[in-house]
From Swiss-Prot:
The keyword Ligase applies. One of its GO terms (molecular function) is nicotinate phosphoribosyltransferase activity. This is Nicotinate phosphoribosyltransferase. Pfam families: NAPRTase, NAPRTase_N. Keywords: Ligase, Phosphoprotein, Pyridine nucleotide biosynthesis. It catalyses: nicotinate + 5-phospho-alpha-D-ribose 1-diphosphate + ATP + H2O = nicotinate beta-D-ribonucleotide + ADP + phosphate + diphosphate. The gene is pncB. It comes from Vibrio vulnificus (strain CMCP6). The modification Phosphohistidine is found at residue 231. Catalyzes the synthesis of beta-nicotinate D-ribonucleotide from nicotinate and 5-phospho-D-ribose 1-phosphate at the expense of ATP. Gene3D superfamilies: nicotinate phosphoribosyltransferase.
């Protein structure tokens, strides 16, 4: 019997995913209909997920049963008018083919430990939706296996304490520029936990909650679906056009794809300095704002505001969105720092969707969310990279490609570090020890 925070089938709706995946799906369908990609699961935390391999495979294979039904398509047409009739017709016929597109197995790390491996291969627009679905599946299976004893009351208590703190601090500090969207789908404790959390938020702080990145829950709770674009859009262009032009082309193509709607630019695929070099007057004018996802939010925001001012653009007409590992305390510090200097908004995920406070099990181990990502590794057979403004978030399988990318964008290339990284990558080369059934 599943506890109240879990359900037998994890993904029960094709809309139980992040808004930006469908946005990028349309853009890939329009501009790059034959582009082939590969995604890889990267587990950053110390969790050994190899024991979950069969359950993960089973849940992913269940995705083949999902369909976009007429009511869901009508909802998308209403809430996302930038999605074209042609694309919605495509969604009507869309099917997942996980047995052909997703490989689930186990590999051995350089340290000799076993770890879960999930690889996604296929045409970009046919495989792009797997990312958030796979991550939601893995997180819930892990928590159902090892943390099923956590009661729903613990989630309520943690949320209520956080909202009490938020209410107190907003009043004490007289902060009036705090608004946020819920963005916890990929790393949620479980679907039921995310749903419970959103129900609490809309009851306690409806005036602060802008919406959610989850289409299914937005529809169920009549909230605004929120989302624009992710790193993979810029990463893919590293293989689709001349590498030195990739970021500019990605920015231009995004505007073209939605006629200027969804105009929030993500700045850290190559790094903030490289981004600003490409974010010229035309682009800075056309885009409604920018999103921070790594590095110091204060240094980043100062650079963005200075850049707008250097172009003769009033930064108070633009929106700065912060989405990097936020809690309420950090968000309020950002609000105070940028008050009156720009419009501010936040996307908050794990802090709301996967925090059980100081809950410990009978062995004295405190609950911690799993840290993982599913990121594009190749596009049309060529490597792609995310450099980031935070070294721990950098991702690339090919050190030579990464060095070339940095050089093309005028970033420092540390040869000694590159050599050591190459040696480390060789030591960490994955050895598959269990093939896909």
């Amino acid at each position: 019997m599943c506890a109240p925070l879990f359900q037998p089938a994890i993904i029960q709706s094709v809309l139980d995913l992040d808004v930006y995946k469908i946005n990028m799906m349309q853009a890939a369908y329009r501009f790059y209909p034959q582009t082939q990609v590969r995604y890889e699961l990267i587990v950053r935390s110390d969790d050994n997920l190899s024991d979950l391999v069969e359950e993960v495979r089973e849940e992913i294979n269940r995705l083949a049963e999902l369909r976009f039904d007429a009511a869901q398509l009508a909802y998308l047409a209403e809430k996302a008018p930038y999605l074209t009739a042609e694309f919605l017709s495509y969604l009507e016929t869309f099917r997942f083919h996980p047995q052909q597109q997703v490989s689930v197995g186990i590999f051995r790390t350089a340290q000799g430990d076993c770890q879960l491996r999930v690889t996604i291969n296929g045409i970009w627009h046919e495989t792009i939706l797997y990312e958030t679905l796979v991550m939601s599946i893995i997180s819930e299976l892990r928590n159902r296996r090892y943390w099923a004893q956590i009661p729903q009351s613990q989630l309520h208590k943690v949320l209520e304490d956080k909202l009490d703190f938020l209410d107190s601090e907003l009043k004490r500090r007289n902060i009036t520029n705090f608004r946020f969207s819920e963005m916890g789908t990929r790393r949620r404790f479980s679907f039921a936990a995310q749903k419970t959390m959103l129900d609490v938020l809309r009851a306690r702080v409806p005036e602060l909650l802008l919406g959610t990145s989850n289409y299914h829950l937005a529809q169920e709770f009549n909230l605004t679906p929120i989302g624009t674009v992710a790193h993979e859009w810029t990463m893919a262009h590293q293989a689709l056009v001349a590498i030195q032009h990739s970021q500019r082309v990605a920015l231009d193509k995004w505007l073209e794809a939605f006629n200027g709607s969804l105009g929030i630019a993500l700045t850290d695929t190559i790094g903030i300095d490289a981004f600003l070099s490409d974010f010229d007057l035309d682009k800075a004018t056309a885009y409604a704002g920018v999103r921070h996802d790594s590095g110091s939010p204060f240094v980043w925001g100062d650079k963005i505001i200075a850049h707008y001012e250097s172009l003769g653009i009033d930064p108070t007409t633009k929106t700065l969105i912060f989405t990097d590992g936020l809690d309420f305390a950090r968000a309020l510090d950002i609000c105070e720092y940028f008050a009156g200097r720009a419009q501010i908004s936040f996307g908050i995920g794990t802090f709301l969707a996967n925090d059980m406070g100081n809950w410990t099990n009978d062995k004295g181990t405190r609950y911690q969310p799993i840290s993982m990502v599913v990121k594009m590794a190749e596009c049309n057979g060529s490597p792609v990279a995310k450099i980031s403004d935070e070294p721990e978030k950098a991702m690339c399988e090919d050190i030579f490609f990464l060095m070339n990318l940095k050089q093309r964008f005028g970033l420092e290339v540390d040869l000694d570090k590159a050599i050591e990284t190459l040696k480390q990558m060789k030591r960490q080369q994955k050895k598959r020890i269990q093939s896909v059934a």
